[in-house]
Amino acid sequence: MVATAAATAELQVAKDYVIADIGLADFGRKELNIAETEMPGLMALRAKYGKDKPLKGARIAGSLHMTIQTAVLIETLVELGADVRWASCNIFSTQDHAAAAMAAGGIPVFAVKGETLEEYWDYTHSILEWGDGGTPNMILDDGGDATGLVMLGSKAEQDITVLDNPSNEEETFLFASIKKKLAKDSSFYSRIKAEIQGVTEETTTGVARLYKMQKSGELPFPAINVNDSVTKSKFDNLYGCRESLVDSIKRATDVMVAGKQALVVGYGDVGKGSAQSLRGLGATVCIAEVDPICALQAAMEGYRVVRLEDVVDQMDIFVTATGNYQVIRNEHLVKMKDEAIVCNIGHFDNEIDVASLKSYEWDNIKPQVDHITLPSGNKIILLAEGRLVNLGCATGHPSFVMSNSFTNQVLAQIELFTKGSEYGKEVYVLPKHLDEMVARLHLEKIGCKLTELSKDQADYINVPVEGPYKPDHYRY
């Protein structure tokens, strides 16, 4: 495969990988070894399933941030028998030493921190093409880009006009990449779609895309919503963001968070973790919400619930965490105070209307940190160009909490690959007993000892002694 060089890295291009620097592999391996000690769930799955290889025959196209923690996930999938190809799901989220460690270990990986949008879609195509002419039969997705590429490409095979009117820069490059592929192979996407046995989706944004396809009757294969496993959403989204948000803001700006006025837009699990993160360092935190239940939760936690437009000229730090688009628009951006910090911890870059800032003066301070001069003369500090700040400006969530999420991913891949015929073309969640198993696998590492129910106690509350302990409708 041939690729152009990313602006920020000299690429090493080999037959079946594209990374920044293979010389970083040893560094990546050392960090990977440390991460393994903090990821007991994945290591337990290797011990439990490594001999039986339940994923033997699985060809997994992985589109998920190429980090050290993801490297542990990849090697777990391989240990369980899978054949894997990998790309990052964000142009800024790759850790180049992690990608190098994977390439050195023989994993076809296509990921460079700071890759262009054109390269991003080239790399996503690369995970769909096996060297022997084969195709993936499973997708492991984060944000839905790999799944969406297959689906949109299939539509374009029937009606190329679906690619006529891109609505933003991202779509411009996506549509161009599909046209380029179809010019070479007019049935590429439909062949892949026909072979996919199932998709497992990591995050809120991608799950929303899957449910939209299910509702319209367009979902062509079963999917597991990993995001809404309790041991994902209530841990990764909440506790992961609680640690990684302020880590990224401080790495990027070196500002003192204490004493600052901060606005978190969105108070779902990600917003809750983000608000705790900022409050924990002494910021005065306000919340903007559309959902009355989430707004009331925020108020009960002592946050002021406000409208963005009412406080936009007062805040020092803005964080979007909604999964929606055009949440902070130009009408808000131009009113911000001097040196306000603006960032996003949702999935895509369109929560903040970054496109509307392109006509202003930009001064790049360092990678993923830009000073933008507004018409008022005030300057704002935009982090990661509005993309995921915790992966663009730092290294994402800690290994331990990602072990929860990725243990769910592996179990979901096993479930759909080995029992796919038992599932319809719908979106599912993992059963409660597996959710509890994921939690159980992580307790010993942090010194927890579970109390055990007696048979009489279990009978009294009508649950098995060994669990599950809560009904599916229980809200943790």
Curated annotation (Swiss-Prot):
Q: Which CDD domains match?
A: SAHH (cd00401)
Q: Where does NAD(+) bind?
A: 203-205, 237, 266-271, 289, 324, 345-347, 390
The reaction(s) annotated as catalysed by this protein in its Swiss-Prot or TrEMBL entry are: S-adenosyl-L-homocysteine + H2O = L-homocysteine + adenosine
Q: Does the keyword Ribosomal protein apply?
A: no
- List GO BP terms, alphabetically: L-homocysteine biosynthetic process; one-carbon metabolic process; S-adenosylmethionine cycle
Q: What role does this protein play?
A: May play a key role in the regulation of the intracellular concentration of adenosylhomocysteine.
- Give the CC-aspect GO terms: cytosol
Could you tell me which InterPro entries the record lists for this protein? Adenosylhomocyst_ase-like_sf, Adenosylhomocysteinase-like, Ado_hCys_hydrolase_NAD-bd, NAD(P)-bd_dom_sf, S-Ado-L-homoCys_hydrolase_CS
Molecular function via GO: adenosylhomocysteinase activity
Major localization class: cytoplasm
Q: What class of enzyme is it?
A: hydrolase
State the SUPFAM superfamilies in the record.
Answer: Formate/glycerate dehydrogenase catalytic domain-like, NAD(P)-binding Rossmann-fold domains
Q: How is the cofactor bound?
A: Binds 1 NAD(+) per subunit.
| Similarity field | Belongs to the adenosylhomocysteinase family.
Q: Keyword annotations for this protein?
A: Cytoplasm, Hydrolase, NAD, One-carbon metabolism
Q: In which pathway does it act?
A: Amino-acid biosynthesis; L-homocysteine biosynthesis; L-homocysteine from S-adenosyl-L-homocysteine: step 1/1
Needed cofactors, names only, are: NAD(+)
Q: Could you tell me which species this protein originates from?
A: Synechococcus sp. (strain CC9311)
Per its record, how is this protein called by name? Adenosylhomocysteinase
Question: Which residues does the record give as substrate binding sites?
Answer: T67, D142, E202, K232, D236
Cite the PROSITE patterns for this sequence.
Answer: ADOHCYASE_1, ADOHCYASE_2
Q: Where in the cell is it found?
A: Cytoplasm
Query: Known EC number(s)?
Result: 3.13.2.1
